Amino acid sequence: MVNIVDSGSKHAPQEMEQFLPGEGKVMYKIQPRKSDTEQALAGNDFDPFALRDNPHPTTDNETLTHLLKASLGTGILGMPFAFMCSGLIMGIFSTIFTAFICTHCSYVLVKCGHKLYYRTRRTKMTFAEIAEAAFQKGPKWCRGFAPVAKFSILFGLFLTYFGTCSVYTVIVASNFEQLISYWTGTAVSLRMLICIMLVPLILIAWVPNLKYLAPVSMVANVFMGLGLGITFYYLVQDLPPVEERESVVWSTLPQFFSITIFAMEAIGVVMPLENNMKTPQSFLGICGVLSQGMSGVTLIYMLLGFLGYLRYGSATGESITLNLPIEEWPAQTVKVLISLAVYCTFGLQFFVCLEIIWDGIKEKCKKRPTLVNYVLRTVLVTAAVVLAVAVPTIGPFMGLIGAFCFSILGLIFPVVIELIVHWESGFGKYNWILWKNAIITLCGIGALVFGTQAAIKDIVKAYSNNENVGE
């Protein structure tokens, strides 16, 4: 258990030195062997958070800013339509339930990641690496599925967020197309506007890391906040009595959940945010970054959905901006602000795609990593823009991909990981973790089925129109 090392200097006697001969006290010094130190570190002495090496860590407030921006995307504009599908009262409780499920799954993913940090002696891991480690450290029957789990998550995340980048490009270009056509009275090519956006998108993709991207997300939050503020101004004008609207609608309630889940879901950015935090422990907890961010997001979602449906009733559009009078300058300002917010959000969505590809090739690019990294950024942005130019109607297809990927990645995979991580330690009293995760899995399957159904209807609707898109 000890090494005896030659020492020519006087030192305070250690416990074992008292039993050495007199000459041994002078000639030798007692030290723990290296293996003893390693064994100690395998216990509670290993702190993955203290050992984490982040050149540009983000503060709690910066992480909260990113989380708000990731959750307050364009999906929030569909909440009034979602409330029309559920009814006013049912919409409130269903929004809280959906937000709780989405937040809990994100919490579970990060919590399992923290447990696996100690088991694998690693200081940070991505979503895919957490799944891989959980399967590798789990029971024997699931260890062979570790590579499949990792690849499935990487493929699903990249497909979803790369497609989202293309959709964001189309959204920004479409809003400016509507405004330019209204102001000038002449039609403008949507594809041309998408091409014009290439350089600005490359510039925002060149922001080196999440630390420097935080101010951009803050600006995006300001733009989105101002846009929503003007929208709320329209919504509170001439409100009818609550009794004139449906309180509970059962027939279209599944459509409410498909809209709300995919609007709130931000599972792809959770681990990148946690991995880049200065104090990762602050991400979880009752007053943690995740709880604070999702509480605020849930409140905004409920207010917009409730007031939007109350104001416009059965005439509520799939996006609340469709109900705003385009001839009035405040409504036009909303379109500009939301377009700018979406543009600023592009960098955060793009970071997920970049991290996936870069983690796979960085070991092969040690000579000029910075140059290769920026070339990769440029190529990915260009590919996203080319996809948007080729298929301006990509939105409905992304709805289908999102329904499939977010249901599995955002709801089902986190609870499966939790079950495997707790396999040996047990699932708690009365197996409550097992029953809880079974309910969440059923919700995920429901979101998958009904979300896919709604997305297919949108695709049919988009291509049943005979007009040429993008000309």
From Swiss-Prot:
<keyword id="KW-1133">Transmembrane helix</keyword>
<dbReference type="Pfam" id="PF01490">
    <property type="entry name" value="Aa_trans"/>
</dbReference>
<keyword id="KW-0524">Neurogenesis</keyword>
<feature type="transmembrane region" description="Helical">
    <location>
        <begin position="81"/>
        <end position="101"/>
    </location>
</feature>
<dbReference type="GO" id="GO:0031090">
    <property type="term" value="C:organelle membrane"/>
</dbReference>
<dbReference type="GO" id="GO:0015179">
    <property type="term" value="F:L-amino acid transmembrane transporter activity"/>
</dbReference>
<keyword id="KW-0967">Endosome</keyword>
<keyword id="KW-1003">Cell membrane</keyword>
<keyword id="KW-0966">Cell projection</keyword>
<dbReference type="GO" id="GO:0005774">
    <property type="term" value="C:vacuolar membrane"/>
</dbReference>
<feature type="transmembrane region" description="Helical">
    <location>
        <begin position="375"/>
        <end position="395"/>
    </location>
</feature>
<protein>
    <recommendedName>
        <fullName>Proton-coupled amino acid transporter-like protein pathetic</fullName>
    </recommendedName>
</protein>
<dbReference type="GO" id="GO:0005765">
    <property type="term" value="C:lysosomal membrane"/>
</dbReference>
<dbReference type="GO" id="GO:0031902">
    <property type="term" value="C:late endosome membrane"/>
</dbReference>
<feature type="transmembrane region" description="Helical">
    <location>
        <begin position="216"/>
        <end position="236"/>
    </location>
</feature>
<feature type="transmembrane region" description="Helical">
    <location>
        <begin position="187"/>
        <end position="207"/>
    </location>
</feature>
<keyword id="KW-0963">Cytoplasm</keyword>
<dbReference type="InterPro" id="IPR013057">
    <property type="entry name" value="AA_transpt_TM"/>
</dbReference>
<keyword id="KW-0458">Lysosome</keyword>
<dbReference type="GO" id="GO:0032536">
    <property type="term" value="P:regulation of cell projection size"/>
</dbReference>
<feature type="transmembrane region" description="Helical">
    <location>
        <begin position="253"/>
        <end position="273"/>
    </location>
</feature>
<comment type="function">
    <text>Amino acid transporter which has pH-dependent electrogenic transport activity for alanine and glycine but not for proline. Plays a role in positive regulation of growth by directly or indirectly modulating the effects of the TOR signaling pathway. Required in a cell-autonomous manner for dendrite growth in neurons with large dendrite arbors.</text>
</comment>
<dbReference type="GO" id="GO:0005886">
    <property type="term" value="C:plasma membrane"/>
</dbReference>
<feature type="glycosylation site" description="N-linked (GlcNAc...) asparagine">
    <location>
        <position position="61"/>
    </location>
</feature>
<dbReference type="GO" id="GO:0043025">
    <property type="term" value="C:neuronal cell body"/>
</dbReference>
<keyword id="KW-0813">Transport</keyword>
<keyword id="KW-0341">Growth regulation</keyword>
<dbReference type="GO" id="GO:0030425">
    <property type="term" value="C:dendrite"/>
</dbReference>
<feature type="transmembrane region" description="Helical">
    <location>
        <begin position="397"/>
        <end position="417"/>
    </location>
</feature>
<dbReference type="GO" id="GO:0015171">
    <property type="term" value="F:amino acid transmembrane transporter activity"/>
</dbReference>
<keyword id="KW-0472">Membrane</keyword>
<dbReference type="GO" id="GO:0097484">
    <property type="term" value="P:dendrite extension"/>
</dbReference>
<feature type="transmembrane region" description="Helical">
    <location>
        <begin position="283"/>
        <end position="303"/>
    </location>
</feature>
<keyword id="KW-0812">Transmembrane</keyword>
<keyword id="KW-0029">Amino-acid transport</keyword>
<keyword id="KW-0325">Glycoprotein</keyword>
<feature type="transmembrane region" description="Helical">
    <location>
        <begin position="153"/>
        <end position="173"/>
    </location>
</feature>
<dbReference type="GO" id="GO:0003333">
    <property type="term" value="P:amino acid transmembrane transport"/>
</dbReference>
<dbReference type="GO" id="GO:0043204">
    <property type="term" value="C:perikaryon"/>
</dbReference>
<dbReference type="GO" id="GO:0048813">
    <property type="term" value="P:dendrite morphogenesis"/>
</dbReference>
<dbReference type="GO" id="GO:0040008">
    <property type="term" value="P:regulation of growth"/>
</dbReference>
<dbReference type="GO" id="GO:0036019">
    <property type="term" value="C:endolysosome"/>
</dbReference>
